[in-house]
């Protein structure tokens, strides 16, 4: 798992840094684990844009990923590591002894032939899944459930990992990638190890066209729009915002405004909030 930088022999390769895909062992996905995927293009059921800057991109087939790891006490073996266009992490095809095939997120450090198993009393090995109550303190985990039996919901991105830091009654404290410490029920399953392909953070698309291939459309600054299109728009030349602070296209405060609802049920499970990112001044990027 490495990255490949290009010489600037064209404008598009000047800043291009991509994965070398050396860990990929199979080009064709398992057909029995593919389903078609309707792309929303940022629209809701009424066709109204609810998420801007989405649309286009290459067609994709969705790979059915086993986030639940509910194949309990049945040994399996990784037979291939594949590319998934729907996520930055790699996926691994697992053959189980009873003949079933499933995809899982590829943990860092596994290879073709690595045995894996999920169950209550399984070895502490990378790729194995078990309840949090049976995982030793200090262990790195990923694909963590928030509701027992629902499947992993957090710590699934490429290179992500959480750490088991404490056990308190019916809960286990996890230190998440955001440095937030959160309590999770001890019956919830998690997978040992970190998600692979951590080098993706060092890649660079290199040109606007590659962003379009991924289904991302251009983002236009509000200050270069007309007043009818954005509160920052209008004026002669490069005019200031004309407000006390930057706002969204709908007039709501942006860039620093807290958006988390008060009195959420999960507040009681968060022992330490995530650390604040670097502060932005009022001269930051337009919303």
Swiss-Prot record:
The keyword rRNA-binding applies. GO terms for cellular component: large ribosomal subunit. Keywords: Ribonucleoprotein, Ribosomal protein, RNA-binding, rRNA-binding. GO terms for molecular function: rRNA binding; structural constituent of ribosome; transferase activity. Residues 214-287 are annotated as: Disordered. The keyword Transferase does not apply. PROSITE patterns: RIBOSOMAL_L2. SMART domains: Ribosomal_L2, Ribosomal_L2_C. GO terms for biological process: translation. Part of the 50S ribosomal subunit. Forms a bridge to the 30S subunit in the 70S ribosome. PANTHER family: LARGE RIBOSOMAL SUBUNIT PROTEIN UL2M, RIBOSOMAL PROTEIN L2. Belongs to the universal ribosomal protein uL2 family. One of the primary rRNA binding proteins. Required for association of the 30S and 50S subunits to form the 70S ribosome, for tRNA binding and peptide bond formation. It has been suggested to have peptidyltransferase activity; this is somewhat controversial. Makes several contacts with the 16S rRNA in the 70S ribosome. NCBIfam families: rplB_bact. This is Large ribosomal subunit protein uL2. The gene is rplB.
